[in-house]
Curated annotation (Swiss-Prot):
Protein name: Uncharacterized protein C1F5.05c
Ranges of Polar residues composition bias in the record: 55-77
GO cellular component: cell division site; cell tip; cytosol; nucleus
Organism: Schizosaccharomyces pombe (strain 972 / ATCC 24843)
Source organism, top-level taxon: Eukaryota
One GO biological process term: vesicle docking involved in exocytosis
Compositionally biased region (Low complexity): 85-105, 123-141
Region of interest (Disordered), ranges: 48-151
Length: 151
């Protein structure tokens, strides 16, 4: 009994400094603070920790231009450049498919807007038919019904 108690008290004293030890300083709160500081330069009132002071504004900031001759790979951010789908596929069926439509980027002012934006993109009108109305769907439905009747 005493050995378990002493072990648990030692474990409680050894804590990761990055662990979630207070309500105001959880991992999620730290990540969200970093996000808002990077995006808008300040924190929303509901996310501010006790005693937080807003950063002093020294004037408008401008993006730093990097000269291509002295740019180091560590200074540049990686970006995703989609490949041309026609070069990826050698079949002729991809040429008849409509070109991919790129959705406009959405600027979110709050964390809730971020989720509302995702929901509105997913609720776009669909042109798909129910499974049973397509030829392959009706074939699947008939096979399913046929197998179900056997048992």
């Amino acid at each position: 009994m005493w050995s378990k108690l002493s072990i648990s008290s030692k474990i409680n004293r050894i804590r990761d400094p990055e662990s979630d030890n207070t309500i105001e300083d959880t991992h999620v709160a730290r990540v969200m603070r970093k996000y808002y500081m990077d995006k808008i330069g300040t924190l929303p009132e509901w996310l501010r920790p006790p005693g937080w002071q807003p950063p002093v504004n020294t004037g408008p900031t401008s993006p730093v231009s990097i000269n291509a001759s002295n740019a180091a790979p560590s200074n540049l951010k990686a970006s995703y450049i989609p490949a041309n789908p026609r070069r990826l596929s050698s079949s002729t069926s991809s040429a008849s498919s409509p070109p991919l439509r790129r959705l406009p980027s959405v600027q979110h002012s709050t964390f809730d807007d971020l989720f509302e934006g995702v929901g509105s993109l997913q609720k776009s009108p669909s042109t798909t038919k129910p499974l049973s109305s397509t030829p392959s769907g009706s074939l699947l439905r008939s096979k399913f019904d046929h197998t179900r009747k056997k048992f």
